UniProtKB/Swiss-Prot annotation:
Dynamic expression pattern during embryogenesis. Expression is seen in the limb primordia of the head and thoracic segments, mesodermal and neurogenic regions. GO terms for biological process: axon extension; axon guidance; canonical Wnt signaling pathway; cell fate commitment; chemorepulsion of axon; dendrite guidance; determination of muscle attachment site; negative chemotaxis. Interacts with porcupine (por). It comes from Drosophila melanogaster (Fruit fly). Residues 238-298, 310-407, 438-472, 790-822 are annotated as: Disordered. Keywords: Developmental protein, Disulfide bond, Extracellular matrix, Glycoprotein, Lipoprotein, Secreted, Signal, Wnt signaling pathway. The lineage of its organism: Eukaryota, Metazoa, Ecdysozoa, Arthropoda, Hexapoda. Residues 389-403 have a biased composition (Basic and acidic residues). Belongs to the Wnt family. The gene is Wnt5. Binds as a ligand to a family of frizzled seven-transmembrane receptors and acts through a cascade of genes on the nucleus. Probable developmental protein. May be a signaling molecule which affects the development of discrete regions of tissues. Is likely to signal over only few cell diameters. May have a role in limb and CNS development; may be a downstream target of Dll that acts in the specification of these primordia. Residues 1-29 form the signal peptide. This is Protein Wnt-5. It is found in: Secreted, Extracellular space, Extracellular matrix.
Amino acid sequence: MSCYRKRHFLLWLLRAVCMLHLTARGAYATVGLQGVPTWIYLGLKSPFIEFGNQVEQLANSSIPLNMTKDEQANMHQEGLRKLGTFIKPVDLRDSETGFVKADLTKRLVFDRPNNITSRPIHPIQEEMDQKQIILLDEDTDENGLPASLTDEDRKFIVPMALKNISPDPRWAATTPSPSALQPNAKAISTIVPSPLAQVEGDPTSNIDDLKKHILFLHNMTKTNSNFESKFVKFPSLQKDKAKTSGAGGSPPNPKRPQRPIHQYSAPIAPPTPKVPAPDGGGVGGAAYNPGEQPIGGYYQNEELANNQSLLKPTDTDSHPAAGGSSHGQKNPSEPQVILLNETLSTETSIEADRSPSINQPKAGSPARTTKRPPCLRNPESPKCIRQRRREEQQRQRERDEWFRGQSQYMQPRFEPIIQTINNTKRFAVSIEIPDSFKVSSEGSDGELLSRVERSQPSISSSSSSSSSSSRKIMPDYIKVSMENNTSVTDYFKHDVVMTSADVASDREFLIKNMEEHGGAGSANSHHNDTTPTADAYSETIDLNPNNCYSAIGLSNSQKKQCVKHTSVMPAISRGARAAIQECQFQFKNRRWNCSTTNDETVFGPMTSLAAPEMAFIHALAAATVTSFIARACRDGQLASCSCSRGSRPKQLHDDWKWGGCGDNLEFAYKFATDFIDSREKETNRETRGVKRKREEINKNRMHSDDTNAFNIGIKRNKNVDAKNDTSLVVRNVRKSTEAENSHILNENFDQHLLELEQRITKEILTSKIDEEEMIKLQEKIKQEIVNTKFFKGEQQPRKKKRKNQRAAADAPAYPRNGIKESYKDGGILPRSTATVKARSLMNLHNNEAGRRAVIKKARITCKCHGVSGSCSLITCWQQLSSIREIGDYLREKYEGATKVKINKRGRLQIKDLQFKVPTAHDLIYLDESPDWCRNSYALHWPGTHGRVCHKNSSGLESCAILCCGRGYNTKNIIVNERCNCKFHWCCQVKCEVCTKVLEEHTCK
């Protein structure tokens, strides 16, 4: 009989232990205190991108203007028209004229009438309307002028007719008149533009106004010395110089040679020295007369003025030119200005390059005093021919390089871009052009071969055969190009269709249309682009949609969005990684240093807490993801978005242009909201769904019925013999159960459960009880288990409100079982006021606060465009701030976070009414932070033991704060390093070995 009782007792004990295990897990399954999986795990290990060792940060090479050179030229002409016909004196101390002050920030206040009630607007538009405008100038000095300009540049103000922004090679070289070769004739050179140039307006139409204006400027320089310092002198227009211009007097050399006017513009190719044609066949058909003064305001340096001047007076008669157009005879004493217009092209004539000759001086003219260059004395020498070929090849390479830089801005007119451009091994883009849109090349085989030859990198040790072949190919190409007479702008008259991603690997994509016209070179030439471009992903990415189902930490709705928008996942992964790195930077000197684990919770069991630290993490992760998506849109890495299309801010000046290529905050804000908040909003989640809640309610009802039945049995057996140690057993069981409650969230839950079983068995076996008392004891144990786990926390009386709310906020929270337990024992407490709905509302609020932080720290950036630093045109766009700036802003919000609770209506409200209501930019939390000073097994937190601190610091990294008053250990570290290094001739560096003793302080 005793064996039967003992067997029955063991079976009952086993059933009680199993029931304890199941009820404990069921009670805390909805709370999720074992750690909540999060999508931030993509920052540790992502199937979409292979992370490197670098720190994630936004690309700072912003693109202020996403447009071609032609569009910039049109904008420049528009700005010149706004300046007026005559240039007025400029006061450098007046900012209204366009010069930038030292204070680059212009604050424009927009006052809205109070009586107007407007409907709610988008948060991005609301923030942009309140932004301060920052006017940028890359290199400015204390006066606000570009620091790269010299003194002569700062006082050089070019008249209207001289402002040619891009000399076009379509203007043909001047044709010499037949009568120019006749001696003893006086004429003025006739300039005949090419037929292509006649389509556009001739910039010499306002020549009379230009002359009057230049004379007006020189009269002003004589009366006002201050005014003279701001302008360039024109010696050829002075009256006394005009009278002696034909006497052979040499012009006085200025203190500093002025820059050519075309250098203030943006030419396609840099100007090269011109070689004069034989017998007056040079520019303007005039022969060179040494000793005479050049006419006009176009100045070269000393070498060009003595040897290769383009602007020369002539004494020959004027006759009709080849084109049939002629100019009337003019008085040689009248001041003349030869403009730098399109007829004076920067491109040299091929015939003049291949067969140059020397201008023979006339009879009676003074002999040349200086020795001419070798190429003028013997232009047919092999050395001079090679030099001319090298110059032509250099100009062609610069033109090709410029077109390659503009190839990425070629947008299709009829087809959208289906896929993005990613320079990776697994994902790349190829460009396909339909046959109906391809343009047949009219060039010969020599032209194609020359382009292939130019695209090869130049190697100093190249063979003689390759160099000779290039010499053979080059003249043919020059001949063909001159016969075809193709213009520079022909490259922009063709469309490019970007259709799909294909097989390009480890190289930049090439636009076929540009390649057919010689506009594209080698694949490695993108490093020399003049326009700043955003680099593609340097890491290897994999955009397979099947990776979304294997990604760890994503919810069901997030996986669905991942499949639909797989191309955005690398940006989200980089944003999650940047959030982890920024969190560790911001908290590196605090007690909790944002340590991570290798599981899907990223931060361990503390993710189940609604503490301020988790509020900061949620806000920072939402902010970084929004920033990286917005920057990826701007850089062209996503096919679903491009540059920002945001509306124009209200405080922006009317004359300023709103455009450029800004960060697409609108798309990033919407996508980040849908992706991140979907975990909190979905209704069929594992721990927060309606179905799970109903099962919990039904389970509570069943246990409530069982408890009522047990209470009836307890009332009948209220008096138990104290000699049998029944009360001692119940007390020990209660203590064991409460200890299990405090450690229920430990990862070693099974081990604690086994210890509890051993304690119960030991207490029962050591006590002397009979069969009837054992039955009563079973009922009491069962009652204690059920009441402790389920109903004691719900039946806890409501606490009275303390007068000191600060003390109440600093006091440790109470668990559901009503037992005061601090965090110092390693146990983790269940949330008292935070329910599942409150935690979801808290996460939604903090996510929105992170996105608002990105909008808050974004700025409106403007840049001046114009000649010599003048703001003839101002372009503005919106630009993101750095991740570090956003992290600093959110850390300040973390320090001022507000504690909230959920009310009866299911909404969050502040717990202490003395504090102000948090806005959408503030952080909120539900639970107080644990004690980070001591180790916690439940939180997987080792405490601050062994942390390095600073002894003499007064901040958070000081030993007094970081060590929590426990003191610190001091350790001396001896370091041997090289010092006092010196270089000895020859080729030796000798250093001494210095010994340093460093002190390291660690917390006890």
